[in-house]
């Protein structure tokens, strides 16, 4: 689908955000370094993950509305 420039920026932001989110999730779930971090830092990273996931959902909804 061809998007207007301002819409394409949202699509690009969504794509980039999801790539960063996947890396963060992989780090949290699979990297032994994560387990060695202080509990407070682990909590902050998990909160960051949740915030990024929520942000991704908002962008997904905006993109869906482009074709509505």
Task: Locate predicted features.
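Extended, charge-rich alpha-helical interface modules
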Residues: 1-68
